[in-house]
C-alpha cells in the first residue's frame, strides 16, 4: 500500500507511517483489464492460507512484475502471489506463486528513495488480451511538467476506505519537481530525483491511495512511474509520489 506521511501534533515534523498490507484510486472510475492488460494485483497473506490484494504491479515479461519495494520489505516470497489477466482484485485471471522478490539495493526505508522492486513468478505468465507486458520508460524518456498520465489500481477510493474490487483508473498530471519538493519540505518529506510527482495540484480529489502501491503510472501507454507514497491521498497541496521509472531502466532490464 502507499505509505503516507502523518503530521506530528503542533509541529511540521512528519513520519512515514508504514501501512498495513493493504492500499485505491481516488476520484477515478471503473475500467477493465483489457484496457490495461499489463496491470496485476499482488496478493498478500498473513497466514499462508488466505491471500488478498494488497499492492499492484505491471507485467514486464513472461516471468516478472514491476512494483514498489516498500510493499515487500521483510517478507518471504511465499507471502505474495500474483494475479494477472483479471479486472477483479480477488477473483478471475491466473494466480501465480512468487518465486523471488528483488528489492532495489539502494532502497531507503526512511525516505522511500529507490522504491522499486521486481517479483519473479514461479510459473510462466501467458500473454493474451488480458495479460501483456508493459512498455517502460527508457533512461532518456522526456516527461514534461503538466503532462496527462493515468494511474490504475484496486486501492482505496478515499483515505481510510476499503479497496476497490474492480480495477479503477484516473487521469492526473505530472507536477514540477521543484514545486513538489518545496511542498513536501513543509511536512518533512524528501523528494529526490528518483521520484516523480503526479496529481491535480491545488485542486485535489484525484490520486492513488492505499492499496495502489506498486501500481503503474502511464504516459502515452508507457510506464513512467510506480506508486510509492504521499501525504494522505488526493490533497490539493500535496501530489502523489512515484518512483521515476526512467531512473531505473537499466536495473529493471537487468533483473526482469
UniProtKB/Swiss-Prot annotation:
> Which GO CC terms are listed, alphabetically?
extracellular region
Q: Which CDD domains match?
A: Tryp_SPc
Q: Which GO terms describe its biological process?
A: proteolysis
**Which residue positions hold the site described Required for specificity?**
207
The active site consists of 70, 115, 213
Kindly list the places in or outside the cell where this protein is found, as annotated in its UniProt entry: Secreted, Extracellular space
State the superkingdom. Answer: Eukaryota
Q: Name one Pfam family in it.
A: Trypsin
Disulphide linkage map: 55-71, 180-197, 209-233
State if Signal is listed as a keyword.
Answer: yes
Question: Residue limits of the Peptidase S1 domain?
Answer: 25-256
Reaction(s) catalysed by this chain's protein: Preferential cleavage: Arg-|-Xaa, Lys-|-Xaa
Excised during maturation, the propeptide residues are 18-24
- Coarsely, its chief localization is secreted
Tell me, what is one Gene Ontology molecular-function annotation carried by this entry?
serine-type endopeptidase activity
Primary role:
Responsible for the activation of delta-endotoxin from Bacillus thuringiensis.
Q: Spell out the protein name for this chain.
A: Trypsin CFT-1
Q: Which organism is it from?
A: Choristoneura fumiferana (Spruce budworm moth)
Q: What is the lineage of its organism?
A: Eukaryota, Metazoa, Ecdysozoa, Arthropoda, Hexapoda
